[in-house]
């Protein structure tokens, strides 16, 4: 019974992770994961199907499926594969973009308004998912009135290197919450 449960947790976790990786455009990694996913699934399914008189194996199989979905999503969140687009509206014009650039983020900014009385700055930042929490925290710290949204980006073409790059040490410190 534990074999069926844990095999099912493993194969569904891999399947969930594989599906998310496919969505992010990593075909080779998804194929590699799928190979191991199906082997584990065959072992778990064979145990249940050859012992249909043991109802608790079906229960372990179903429970493993449920836990595997949660585990797969958690694993993918931990790896934080891919990029995200952060759109930010700042009411403190010409402040936030400069500070974010000083911290090493690649920022595109536009001046705008929300009516005559509300000049704003619209910021666009494409950032690796693992760095987004520190970027959001920085936005909140620098401009608590800022409005932002975050969306997935399937692929990014970086083009010419016109933005300064952050060092690995700087990125690591940002991830740990130290600036």
Curated annotation (Swiss-Prot):
Compartmental location: Cell membrane
CDD domains: YitT_C_like_1
Spans traversing the lipid bilayer: 28-48, 55-75
Coiled coil: none
Organism: Psychromonas ingrahamii (strain DSM 17664 / CCUG 51855 / 37)
Bilayer topology: Multi-pass membrane protein
Database matches in PANTHER family: UPF0316 PROTEIN YEBE
Cellular component per GO, a single term: plasma membrane
Superkingdom of the source species: Bacteria
Protein's UniProt name: UPF0316 protein Ping_1367
Pfam annotation, one family: DUF2179
Keywords: Cell membrane, Membrane, Transmembrane, Transmembrane helix
Family, per entry: Belongs to the UPF0316 family.
Main location: membrane
């Amino acid at each position: 019974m534990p074999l069926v449960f844990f095999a099912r947790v493993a194969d569904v976790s891999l399947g969930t992770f594989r599906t998310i990786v496919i969505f992010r455009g990593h075909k080779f990694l998804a194929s590699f994961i799928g190979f191991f996913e199906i082997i584990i699934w065959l072992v778990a399914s064979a145990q249940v199907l050859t012992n249909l008189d043991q109802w608790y194996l079906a229960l372990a199989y179903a429970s493993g499926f449920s836990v595997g979905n949660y585990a797969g999503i958690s694993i993918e969140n931990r790896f934080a594969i891919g990029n995200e687009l952060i759109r930010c509206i700042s009411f403190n014009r010409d402040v936030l973009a400069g500070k974010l650039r000083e911290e090493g983020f690649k920022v595109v900014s536009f001046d705008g308004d929300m009516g005559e009385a509300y000049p704003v700055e619209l910021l666009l930042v494409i950032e690796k998912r693992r760095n987004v929490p520190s970027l959001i925290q920085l936005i909140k710290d620098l401009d608590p009135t800022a409005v932002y949204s975050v969306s997935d980006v399937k692929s990014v073409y970086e083009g010419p290197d016109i933005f300064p790059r952050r060092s690995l040490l700087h990125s690591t410190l940002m991830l740990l919450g130290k600036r």
